[in-house]
From Swiss-Prot:
This is Baculoviral IAP repeat-containing protein 7-A. Changing S247A: Abolishes phosphorylation, but no effect on caspase inhibitory activity. The lineage of its organism: Eukaryota, Metazoa, Chordata, Craniata, Vertebrata. Residues 219-269 are annotated as: Self-inhibits the anti-apoptotic function. Changing S251D: No effect on caspase inhibitory activity or auto-ubiquitination activity. No effect on protein stability or anti-apoptotic activity. GO terms for molecular function: cysteine-type endopeptidase inhibitor activity; cysteine-type endopeptidase inhibitor activity involved in apoptotic process; ubiquitin protein ligase activity; zinc ion binding. BIR repeats lie at residues 43-109, 148-213. SUPFAM superfamilies: Inhibitor of apoptosis (IAP) repeat. Residues 110-134, 231-257, 312-343 are annotated as: Disordered. Zn(2+) binds at C182, C185, H202, C209. GO terms for cellular component: cytoplasm; nucleus.
Amino acid sequence: MSRWSVSQGCGNSHKALTMAGHGEQLFRGWGMVRPSMRSEAERLRSFSAWPRTCPQPSPVEMARSGFYYLGPGDRVQCFSCGGVLRSWEPGDRPDTEHRKFFPSCTFLQQQQRDPGATDSQILGQHSGEEPDRTWESVYPEMAEERDRLDSFRNWPMYAHGNPEHLAGSGFFYTGHRDNVKCFHCDGGLRNWEQGDDPWTEHAKWFPMCDFLLHVKGEAFIRRVQESLFRSPESSPDSLGSYIYDRSPASSPGSPESWRYLQSSVAQDALQMGFKQSLVASLIQSKFLLTGSSYSSVSDLVTDLLVAEEETHSTESVSVSRAPTRMERSEPPKESAPPLSTEEQLRRLKEERMCKVCMDKDVSMLFVPCGHLVVCTECAPNLRHCPICRAAIRGSVRAFMS
């Protein structure tokens, strides 16, 4: 174990790279260097890129002790004091090493005074007030459990899932098939199967929901997220070639870039059909600029769609401007007349039109296939993507610019 604080060597350059514009002055009174990692669940998610060759301690122990994964290698950083540790060895305990090298850490000191306190309670004591959490629900009219339960009056007989359990877990029935939504975070789930536990699914897909955190606590979310890390499905060896296509055309190009494809968020994007090189590039860029990875598939997909659009625009301009041998050696052929403005607008409107109702604009991205072909009103009626016929597990709202 060796110490590497943010005030030494490479630490200074890293701080200058990652701290600018991320609330250092605002949160200084709280003693937080990385406020975005103040949640234990969020710190645990950062370890999705933790090298599999690294020995213990486990990501769960790291996150519980205030550390999130910084990289490269086995470098971790405390969200509160900014202390960085690396060169972990078997038998090392994160809390012990934290106390050994950074004894003045505010988070560590408060944790020692109140071992049972959650991150949110500790942060509230840092600032002398309640933790900064907005409890503005997306659907405040469904904040009462009895109102959510009333929404299940027309719950289909064929649908799996107990309405009382679903309502108690924050979900209300949307009125379409077996689609439910969380009143607070707007997270939507469908295609319920026998044995699915609403709270577990809530923590699996929407771990940052404040209602979930308030009712179940960080320990529950941590256990659910930890089970995802240990799941055989997350192992590269068990993933199909359609996810990890190692052909030169799609390879990110370097072992360092390959590391960014190990997270569950990256794997979901790859399953949607996005290029490995583009996914790795975006995740790597975000990590270098902010010091953290994407926390949700929707954020990554939004950036991927923008990046693809920019790439296509650049390629079309390059192709139109690049002369070819044929253009220099042969007389130009008659080209089709340019499209009128009205025709261009008609085609653009047609591309953005919902392929089901043929009326409203497309706005819902299906998971896991990634197709964007229907509007908000038509999406709940579908169980399979109309393009590829893949089963729809979830959907993400997309905003067209």
